[in-house]
Amino acid sequence: PCEVGKDAPAYILFTSGTTGRPKGVPVTFGNVEAFLEAFALLGISLLPEDRCLQMFDLTFDLSVGSYLPPLIAGACVYTVRLGSIKWQEVFRLMDDYRLTVTLMVPSVIHYLRPYLSELSAPDLRYSLFCGEALMVDDVVPWKQVASHATVWNVYGPTENTIYCTAYRVGSHDI
């Protein structure tokens, strides 16, 4: 195998362009390594038997956060089917495969809200939310579905390698 330095690009993603034109962001192997180290410091311990959700387009940086840590841990990654309605597919995957780890945008809860009484996620250990503001009004019904899950609110722009801030939502927050 060839040696790859920390400054070498691991991949390039484009920003959404909300502040102007989209721009390509080269993410280095050093950036990815730092993200994985920070992820481990959160205390989120992925196991080979975990079943993890990957709901994002591969052009979105959150997709990397959805598949890279699980694959490194030897866990399974379940993806939404191409062309599917994402919230319906999330419901199906959670129900069919008893997912243990999810990283989603909070709006998924809004779409699932009418069906939450039909969904039970007792195996869900970690539920991370990113990409939009996570409101208490979303967390309360979600915790009824996923009562054993630790909920995290994470955030970060593409330029900071997936996400760079994390807050563990506790019972005192809801």
What would you call each of these model-derived segments?
Residues 1-174:
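Motif- and composition-driven signal specific to adenylation
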